Structure formats: C-alpha cells, structure tokens
Amino acid sequence: MHSPPYLLSPAPNTPFPPAEYALREPNGLLAIGGDLTPQRLLAAYRNGIFPWFTEGQPPLWWSPDPRTVFRSDSIHLSRRFRRNLRTSTWTVRADTMFAAVIDACASTPRRGQDGTWITANMREAYLTLHQHSYAHSVEVFDGTMLVGGIYGVALGRMFFGESMFSTRNGASKIALASLAHFLHTHSAPLIDAQVENQHLLNLGAERWPRKDFLAYVRRLITQTDLPACWSVLFGEQLSRELV
C-alpha cells in the first residue's frame, strides 16, 4: 500500500483508505483527488473524512487527530450573551435559504485564509446534497434580513458541520445553539466541527481522539436518519427562546 496522502481514482465508488492512515503533518491529510459527487461525499462523511481545499487545488480529504466536536447538549453561551438574548427579536428557521447561507459562508473573510475553500464546485456539490435532504442549514433573521447561519450534512443521528457565518454580532452563535437544540431534541448527540479554533472552544467544543470520534460516527450513522423536513419541524423560532 502506498504512503499517505493516497491518490483517489476518478471513479466515485473508489473506497477511501482508513482515516487512521492520515498524515500527522499536515495534520489529517489523507487523500488527494477524486470528485465531489454525492456518492463520494457521503462515503467520506461515513468514514469520518471531509473535503477541504482551495480554488486551483485538487480535492483534498482530511481526518485530523484530535477531532473537534460539540455535544448537542453542551453549547456554551455566556451569561452576558444570554441576557442580551432576552430582548432579541431575531428569528431562526431551517432549510429556507440554504444557498444564501453557503454563499455567505463563502464570502466571509477568515483569519489566516486567502480566498475561500467553498469553490463553485463545492457549492454545487452541497446544493445537490441539500436537494436530496442530506445537507441542511439553520438561518438567523433580523426581520427579513439573513444575518447568520450554519450548514452541514446529516447522516443517521450524526451532524457534520461545514461552516457558519454572521453579519451581526452573535448571529452564528444563535445558529449553532439552535441547531444543537434541534439535534438534541431528536436524539442526535454530536456535531462534528472538524478543526479546532479558539472561538469554537469558547463555545464548548471538545477535542476528541480520532479513534473515539470514529467509533461514535460508525455507531450514529447506522441509526434512523433525522427527519428530512427540517423547515417544517423548525418553523419560525424566536432566538430568545434559547435562554
């Protein structure tokens, strides 16, 4: 067997190598190539692997160790933030503006990054997953204006977060907390947050050994899928209901 990173064939049914074979440096790089078909993307998530690359690069596939994870019942919102929420008139919905959420995530500047990893091909791939009820978004509104959101992929009782954004202070926190509450209510205990940063850790993210994360993924993806009709189940919630 070749040393990592492994070169994937263009055939979408080509299996991924085990995530445990990923490089230590750069942390988690496992494979290069392949494509972004729904079949390939879903196979990646089922094996604890995600795509992350920039314009001009071939698809790069990652499974870092440790893995950053949220428990859906343990999102941390500060006391001050919760106090401010009590007077908030913002509302939260799901799956009503998926394309707008992914576009806003793509256009949001990120510290230490030039450009965006959400390429045109990546965008189209996740729109296809959304059309097949695998990818979902949670959106925060100030009146009719979209001010924050998060999107990712749901398989079984596992949610794989991809990106979030806010144009108003705290809107992405509300999106994350609303997503977590929804998942916890539907017996989905984990949100994959992929790679750590201080902002995520401040919100309650934990660093798990990859082997523990993979064990949870293997168990949770075999459970009954979350309901597909997120927009109906979510309805329109007031953000202050999170307090």
Curated annotation (Swiss-Prot):
GO terms for cellular component: cytoplasm. The keyword Chloroplast does not apply. The keyword Cell division does not apply. One of its GO terms (biological process) is protein catabolic process. It is an enzyme of class 2 (transferase). Transmembrane segments: none annotated. Belongs to the L/F-transferase family. This is Leucyl/phenylalanyl-tRNA--protein transferase. It comes from Xylella fastidiosa (strain 9a5c).
